[in-house]
Amino acid sequence: MPGHLQEGFGCVVTNRFDQLFDDESDPFEVLKAAENKKKEAGGGGVGGPGAKSAAQAAAQTNSNAAGKQLRKESQKDRKNPLPPSVGVADKKEETQPPVALKKEGIRRVGRRPDQQLQGDGKIIDRRPERRPPRERRFEKPLEEKGEGGEFSVDRPIIERPIRGRGGLGRGRGGRGRGMGRGDGFDSRGKREFDRHSGSDRSSFSHYSGLKHEDKRGGSGSHNWGTVKDELTESPKYIQKQISYNCSDLEQSNVTEETPEGEEHPVADTENKENEVEEVKEEGPKEMTLDEWKAIQNKDRAKVEFNIRKPNEGADGQWKKGFVLHKSKSEEAHAEDSVMDHHFRKPANDITSQLEINFGDLGRPGRGGRGGRGGRGRGGRPNRGSRTDKSSASAPDVDDPEAFPALA
């Protein structure tokens, strides 16, 4: 019973309208099959209310099992009804003693959806009968997309890859998320496209009709013109070659057709003259040194100098000129003026009143910093006494008697 409850619960969740015109089989044919079974059972001479009730119960179970099986299969192909030939074949097979595939049917849909088990456990390969609805699914995209989208529909059914258990990725117990099934369909009816947007590569290039083409639209990066440009350029090149070849052939034919004594010698003389001129031009030019110098002098620009003799054409205004010599007195006066300029002092100069000591310029801060009495190093301020000694011995700069050698 839990299996029945789970199945009923699953039908309600997946499709609430599951029981509205979901059976593809004709109920009248199911009833006819049940009546035939009744007749066969009653033909043996067994007739009674018990036999009739048993036959009715068997017919109901058969119809319920067939309805459930068709519900599971029709959820994928509801929009694409089967052709009449396929429907008749399915109905004939359904009249055989069916088996209600509850749990095993759910499990085996992922393994081999193209195979089913009969009551004796034999595997029936119904793949060629289920193919037509899938081919009809491809017909609409082909008509809508036109030339742009092409899918491989013309390939026969036998050449398609076998969708075995686990296959390339999506089957039960397979290798995880692989390349999906070969024909681009999942076990749940979901389709996996071979090519995604923005990619030129297709996973099944030898199956699909998509062809990889370079970006040659003439715009954007990595575009080198269009295919039409090559088609338009190539005939010109071929025509030029053909025209050149034709002209060569015509010349050869003319030379062959002309007799030996008429125009042939004229052409030979012209060819000889051209050959002689070419040979002369190709040879190196030889000349003597004098000829080469003459050519160089012609090309060289001549420089003209205004050469004249001494006192020739001299200007008369410069005749009275004489040379000036510097006197020694002027040089001494210039030296005195320079010294006065450096040592002359204004009346309000106070530099003589300032005390300038040149004692210890190398270490000026040692004496003043000598306190540090708090740390017990108070003996260092005595170094400041050097400045007093140096100040006492320093000469007075303004006193001329302190520098007798300069007097």
From Swiss-Prot:
Task: Give the modified residues of type N6-acetyllysine.
Answer: 52, 68, 122, 140, 211, 328
Here the segments flagged for biased composition (Polar residues) are: 242-256
Among the Pfam families in the record, one is HABP4_PAI-RBP1
GO molecular function annotation: mRNA 3'-UTR binding; ribosome binding; RNA binding; SUMO binding; translation elongation factor binding; translation repressor activity
Q: Taking the first listed entry, what is the main subcellular location of this protein, grouped into a coarse class? A: cytoplasm
Bias kind Low complexity: ranges: 51-68
Kindly indicate whether the keyword Nucleotide-binding belongs to this entry: no
Function statement: Ribosome-binding protein that promotes ribosome hibernation, a process during which ribosomes are stabilized in an inactive state and preserved from proteasomal degradation. Acts via its association with EEF2/eEF2 factor, sequestering EEF2/eEF2 at the A-site of the ribosome and promoting ribosome stabilization and storage in an inactive state. May also play a role in the regulation of mRNA stability: binds to the 3'-most 134 nt of the SERPINE1/PAI1 mRNA, a region which confers cyclic nucleotide regulation of message decay. Seems to play a role in PML-nuclear bodies formation.
Q: What is this protein called?
A: SERPINE1 mRNA-binding protein 1
Which species is this record about? Rattus norvegicus
